């Protein structure tokens, strides 16, 4: 519907009949409400065009004068503007993103200019870009001083001048009819950045444009800044497809606006400048940090300033102060929200009362938290109550005034934002693990009846002599439920007290050269049952040791137990590390994530000779490897419970890890090589001398063309020379395939066509082919796949030749590298499935699990290697139960039951859909035969979700404390 304005055009008419501000939104609920709050005292008309998938129905309730249009199909900028110009009834309008703030006074001045100058079609002032952070707002140069009056008599003349500066006119106040004419000619189907550029060109082409020497607005930086490099584009190169689109757009614009030949170059140049418009870091103008004590910002100006711009006056800075209050009270930017997650995590931790009498008083903790971010209403309320109880009248008055100001803003409590973050979810999940008062009493009584349960020696390394970090660790231990512990601190600082090894808290003076010996000495003299290493600043969870004390009573065979942990990331947020059951290959591949903070039986630690001085930066990893060398894998276990919150390890190569891994592999008889494909991880080349014959069994043939692609990929991309390919053929396609193979050169002689009757299922065919196979190792390869890397057979053999390994599987990908299968997880989405589906080829995955070799419960027949001897010993595929589907899962589980490992390797990549064959009968048979394994995959942590994409946080649930007491 094309609405023509019947409103008076003179300045005497009400403002809402003369001018409409159009806000464009897409999944920006908080920013939209914040913007509407900014404009609430203005009397102009407002229209919201919201392309979010879900309607924001509350907008018109909260802001009754606002017209709201839900337009989920209007994704692009131009689509939204077209919706707007159809509905706006006023003669003038301006367009702004929901993240932007236009200044009402500037809009009024621009409107008055256009009303007084009929020959002009658009008017605006100068704007800044902003980037909101947790504690500050940074402002960046956006518009530069240049021509302010594009008043050429012709479009060509205006374009020639406009090409010099190219200010963005996206938010300019314009005549509604000007935009209607322009959008009648503008091409569609381009991305939003090109549409915005076309919008600006249309205004300059249609009429004169004026820039007033006034502050006009501030725009969120990421909405107006072009990324440094498009995704997938290397630095210094151009996205050729984007360049082609830009050229196509410039041609269409020139045609649409009837530009003369001489003006076409101007159109091209302007479009290029507008599209490439960016806000470089060097354009930062000022930094405005919120002072929580004063309730206002404190500004710091950069050394380079642009005093020719109209921003340097108190009135504008007062406006910025009001906007900054809104930005902090209703945060929405990605950078800001991520930083606030870390800040509010710290606030959450500081707001907890401490049991430790030596801890920092609660009022001081809360006051410190308030200074970091004053807009957390829960924190303000708690601090106010504490200060009222303390009787600090001056502080109370300040807090009461601030609380009223926050309430008057009427935004959602920012504390709820934290609840939705990963850190907030993890803390809430962790709190649910704590026992109730009655459960605590029952568990304590249970342990007391068993000599108090196991005792834990907590070995804390304090090589930086950081008393604040030490205090955090002490507080966490005291706040826990476990009381069967002794703490030994190995510090390079001055000893705070004289203690003895019998003390609950014992300090030992160490230096860089002797701390390992001192640790070993303490361990040998300790009367604790279990030892655990930690660093100053690590915080034990309230219930981790408490649960371990109960569980370990029932596990006398355990020598060492891994638990889970939360890690503080470099940005201050939390990430979970939910480890699998003992996973030898994952331990070897990524020890920084797998080898830390194990509970080790003290007598085992002593028997192994303690920690090694030779590998100081990999002490725990080296100890575990020596334990494997001495006792195998039987005494190693895992408990699905977070033990502590610690600093995330640095993502870097560790020479000590590599050295002890090489030492360990040599003990196991391998002359191996260890490299780091990804920093912080290890890739082991076992360097086997054997070159066994490999039989590749192609199965699942449906389409002859797909089969030919599969065979070509094997014949052309396989570097390994000792292999054969077995292909089933029926009478119908045998001669066709043989003729095709005859034309493929001498490599095709490796392919053997085996006659097989129609309708033979996958399981039966693989069983039959295995009997015809001449190779010592079998590879199943589905016929619609293509191998990618030339060393794929060598990489499979690198694992399969290990005596402890039974089955090896590959990484399945789309043609663009996206993951389709990365090992199989039992019970995922109520069946058997893969995690990481759809992840890009550059993804590292949860705990690096997309880039390192690891053990898993099963891999699929899409690409699977097993020795022929083991395949026969396992009686092949169970064709009675799993002939059509899930025979691969059943085979892997039977091989695992026999004591062999299944290894998934990312170093073999195969193009294939990754869809696992499944039938109701096969699923039922698998559930009946392997119910225990399906109930909990031992290589998938029980705290992780079994629904969805995998490796996400599972539901919040309590520990069944009473059930543990058996």
PLM region spans:
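Conserved donor NDP-sugar-binding/catalytic core segment of glycosyltransferases
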Residues: 107-140, 543-574, 633, 786-830
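Short, acidic, metal-binding catalytic loop of nucleotide-sugar glycosyltransferases
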Residues: 36-45, 474-484, 712-722
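Non-catalytic membrane-proximal stalk/linker segments that position and tether the catalytic domains
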Residues: 1-16, 281-456, 461-468, 472-473, ...
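Active-site donor/metal-binding and catalytic loop motifs
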Residues: 128-136, 170, 185, 205-235, ...
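A short, conserved alpha-helix in the catalytic core of glycosyltransferases
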Residues: 178-182, 189-212, 604, 614-635, ...
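A recurrent flexible, glycine/aromatic-enriched loop bordering the glycosyltransferase active site
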Residues: 153-174, 575-603, 771, 827-869
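Short aromatic/hydrophobic "clamp" motif used to bind/position activated sugar donors
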Residues: 93, 531, 778
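Glycine-rich, basic loop-to-helix element that forms the pyrophosphate-binding segment
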Residues: 71-88, 510-526, 756-773
């Amino acid at each position: 519907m094309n609405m023509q304005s019947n409103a008076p055009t003179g300045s005497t008419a009400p403002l809402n009949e003369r001018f409409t501000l159009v806000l464009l939104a897409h999944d920006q609920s908080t920013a939209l409400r914040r913007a509407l709050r900014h404009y609430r005292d203005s009397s102009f008309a407002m229209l919201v065009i919201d392309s979010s998938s879900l309607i924001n129905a509350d907008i018109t309730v909260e802001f009754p004068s606002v017209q709201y249009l839900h337009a989920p199909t209007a994704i692009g900028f131009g689509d939204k503007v077209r919706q707007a110009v159809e509905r706006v009834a006023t003669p003038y309008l301006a367009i702004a993103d929901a993240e932007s703030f236009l200044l009402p006074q500037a809009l009024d001045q621009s409107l008055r200019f256009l009303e007084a100058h009929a020959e002009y079609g658009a008017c605006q002032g100068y704007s800044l870009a902003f980037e909101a952070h947790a504690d500050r707002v940074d402002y960046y140069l956006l518009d530069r001083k240049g021509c302010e009056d594009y008043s050429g008599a012709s479009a060509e003349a205006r374009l020639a001048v406009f090409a010099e500066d190219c200010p963005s006119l996206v938010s300019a106040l314009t005549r509604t009819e000007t935009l209607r004419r322009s959008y009648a000619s503008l091409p569609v189907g381009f991305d939003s950045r090109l549409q915005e550029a076309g919008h600006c060109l249309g205004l300059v082409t249609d009429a004169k444009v004026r820039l007033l020497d006034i502050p006009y607005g501030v725009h969120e930086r990421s909405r107006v800044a072009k990324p440094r490099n498009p995704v997938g584009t290397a630095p210094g190169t151009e996205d050729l497809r984007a360049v082609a689109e830009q050229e196509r757009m410039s041609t269409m614009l020139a045609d649409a606006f009837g530009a003369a030949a001489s003006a076409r170059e101007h159109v091209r140049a302007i479009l290029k400048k507008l599209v490439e418009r960016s806000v470089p870091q060097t354009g930062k103008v000022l930094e405005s940090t919120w002072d929580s004590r004063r309730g206002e910002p404190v500004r710091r100006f950069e050394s380079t300033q642009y005093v020719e711009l109209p921003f340097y006056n108190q009135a504008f800075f007062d406006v910025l102060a009001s906007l900054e209050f809104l930005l902090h009270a209703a945060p929405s930017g990605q950078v800001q929200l991520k930083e606030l997650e870390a800040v509010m995590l710290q606030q959450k931790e500081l707001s907890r009362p401490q049991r430790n009498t030596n801890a920092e008083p609660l009022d001081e903790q809360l006051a410190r938290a308030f200074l970091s971010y004053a807009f957390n209403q829960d924190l303000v309320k708690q601090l106010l109550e504490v200060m009222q109880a303390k009787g600090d009248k001056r502080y109370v008055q300040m807090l009461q005034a601030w609380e009223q100001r926050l309430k008057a803003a009427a935004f959602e409590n920012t504390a709820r934002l934290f609840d939705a973050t990963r850190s907030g979810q993890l803390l809430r999940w962790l709190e649910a693990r704590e026992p109730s008062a009655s459960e605590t009493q029952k568990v304590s009584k249970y342990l007391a009846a068993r000599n108090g349960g196991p005792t834990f020696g907590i070995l804390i390394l304090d090589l930086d002599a950081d008393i604040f970090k030490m205090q955090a660790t002490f507080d966490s231990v005291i706040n826990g439920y476990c009381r069967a512990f002794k703490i030994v601190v190995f510090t390079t600082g001055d000893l705070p007290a004289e203690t003895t090894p019998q003390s609950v808290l014992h300090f030992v003076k160490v230096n860089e050269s002797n701390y390992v010996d001192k640790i070993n000495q303490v361990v040998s003299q300790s009367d604790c049952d279990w030892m655990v290493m930690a660093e100053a600043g690590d915080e034990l969870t309230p219930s981790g040791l408490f649960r371990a004390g109960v569980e370990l009573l029932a596990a006398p065979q355990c020598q060492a137990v891994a638990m889970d942990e939360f890690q503080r990331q470099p940005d201050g947020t939390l990430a979970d590390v939910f480890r699998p059951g003992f996973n030898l290959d994952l331990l070897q591949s990524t020890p920084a994530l797998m080898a830390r903070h194990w509970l080790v039986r003290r007598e085992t630690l002593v028997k192994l000779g303690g920690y090694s001085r030779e590998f100081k930066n990999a002490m725990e990893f080296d100890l575990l490897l020596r334990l494997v060398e001495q006792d195998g894998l039987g005494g190693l276990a895992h408990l699905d419970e977070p033990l502590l919150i610690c600093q995330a390890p640095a993502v870097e190569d560790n020479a000590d890890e590599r050295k002890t891994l090489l030492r360990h592999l040599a003990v196991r008889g391998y002359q191996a090589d260890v490299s780091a494909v990804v920093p912080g991880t290890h890739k082991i080349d076992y360097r086997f001398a054997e070159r066994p014959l490999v039989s590749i069994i192609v199965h699942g043939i449906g389409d002859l063309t797909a089969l030919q692609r599969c065979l070509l990929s094997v014949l052309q991309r396989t570097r390994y020379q000792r292999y054969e390919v077995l292909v089933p053929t029926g009478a119908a396609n045998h001669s066709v395939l043989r003729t095709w193979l005859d034309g493929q050169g001498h490599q095709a002689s490796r392919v053997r066509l085996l006659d097989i009757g129609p309708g033979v299922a996958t399981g039966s065919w693989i069983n039959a082919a295995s009997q015809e196979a001449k190779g010592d190792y079998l590879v199943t390869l589905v016929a619609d796949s293509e191998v990618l890397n030339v060393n794929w057979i060598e990489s499979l053999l690198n694992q399969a030749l290990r005596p402890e390994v039974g089955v090896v599987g590959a990484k399945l990908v789309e043609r663009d590298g996206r993951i389709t299968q990365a090992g199989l997880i039992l019970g995922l989405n109520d069946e058997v499935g893969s995690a990481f589906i759809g992840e890009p080829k550059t993804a590292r995955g949860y705990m690096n699990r997309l880039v390192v070799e690891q053990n898993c419960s099963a891999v699929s027949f899409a690409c699977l290697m097993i020795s022929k001897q083991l395949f026969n010993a396992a009686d092949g595929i169970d064709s009675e139960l799993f002939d059509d589907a899930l025979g691969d899962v059943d085979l892997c589980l039977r091989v695992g039951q026999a004591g062999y490992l299944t290894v998934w390797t990312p170093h073999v990549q195969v193009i294939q859909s990754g869809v696992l064959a499944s039938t109701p009968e096969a699923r039922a048979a698998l559930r009946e035969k392997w119910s225990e394994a399906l109930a909990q995959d031992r290589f998938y942590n029980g705290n992780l979700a079994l629904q969805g994409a995998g490796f996400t946080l599972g539901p919040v649930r309590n520990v069944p404390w009473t059930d543990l007491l058996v």
